[in-house]
């Protein structure tokens, strides 16, 4: 969760066919993104660049998988884990954090690392509240987001090593 800082539902219900591990990309279908249901059918997929550390973890996870889901339910491989499962796992490891809190931490630290707000907001799949700008600006900032996500993963690894 800290590496990709997507929403709880986006991660826990992720399916293997959304990933291209060779290209280090994850495309979350628009229908699974936050928003009004009637708007989702036309929503493009959300691009999540995967740092090399994430790709390595996903290959390891995929090796032992027998489900279409990254995180299948314990007793039903054709369903994803429950809404509460990630929080329960965090508590089990005595980690005082909510799942959504990873998004706050990432946004705050990436701003402190001087990444531009529009790059961070694009990665977090936040809509631009300025309707005129949102209408005209369809930039995805892919190159910048790829670099940012690798820098973020390297930063997390450095914290873990210290």
Regions found by a protein language model. Give the residues of each.
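Active-site/catalytic core of tyrosine-dependent DNA strand-transfer enzymes
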Residues: 23, 49-97, 101, 105-106, ...
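Conserved tyrosine-mediated DNA breakage-rejoining catalytic core shared by Y-recombinases
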Residues: 13-60, 128-134
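Short, charged phosphate-coordinating catalytic segments
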Residues: 1-25, 117-122
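Generic hydrophobic alpha-helical scaffold/packing signal
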Residues: 1, 12, 59, 87, ...
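Catalytic-site neighborhood detector that most strongly recognizes the C-terminal catalytic loop/helix
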Residues: 30-36, 55, 113, 124-159
């Amino acid at each position: 969760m800290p590496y990709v800082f997507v929403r709880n539902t986006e991660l826990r219900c992720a399916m293997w066919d959304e990933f291209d591990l060779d290209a280090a990309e994850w495309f979350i279908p628009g229908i699974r993104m936050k928003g009004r249901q009637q708007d989702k059918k036309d929503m493009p997929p959300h691009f999540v660049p995967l740092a090399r550390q994430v790709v390595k973890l996903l290959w390891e996870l995929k090796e032992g998988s027998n489900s279409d889901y990254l995180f299948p339910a314990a007793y039903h491989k054709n369903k994803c884990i429950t809404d509460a499962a990630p929080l329960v796992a965090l508590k089990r490891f005595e980690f005082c954090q909510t799942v959504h809190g990873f998004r706050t931490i990432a946004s705050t630290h990436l701003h402190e690392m001087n990444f531009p707000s529009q790059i961070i907001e694009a990665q977090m799949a936040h809509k631009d509240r300025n309707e005129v700008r949102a209408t005209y600006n369809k930039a995805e900032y892919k190159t910048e987001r790829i670099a940012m996500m690798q820098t973020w993963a390297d930063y997390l690894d450095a914290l873990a090593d210290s």
